[in-house]
């Protein structure tokens, strides 16, 4: 696991625990987003996500962490000029109408600066994943997406 992940993982673990255990926290994450009306009270797809992500073998990191785009030119979700290749975490929610939302979570440490094009790349990558999940065997099918950024006030 990269050094950054090991530093961020305790925070991401806490976020994941909240998302997996509390509808209130899931609702809080999507409140104020375009997904709010459709996904309030949605179920979390823990077992489905784990099964898809670990279908070949269990990885070192948690099943919800570090969704990589790929470093080669074949990655259609790479953003021109940006060095960002991954989403720190993705959580999948199913609405009462059986639609699925991918909640892409990005984490920045206090006083950590954004790289060139990094904040702009988050929603573009999430949108790309929603259009290309059928070619990504470890990404759950989903209809909609949002990005959520956890960071210090100084980062904004």
Show the residue positions of the predicted features.
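Charged, terminal alpha-helix-loop-beta segments
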Residues: 1-156
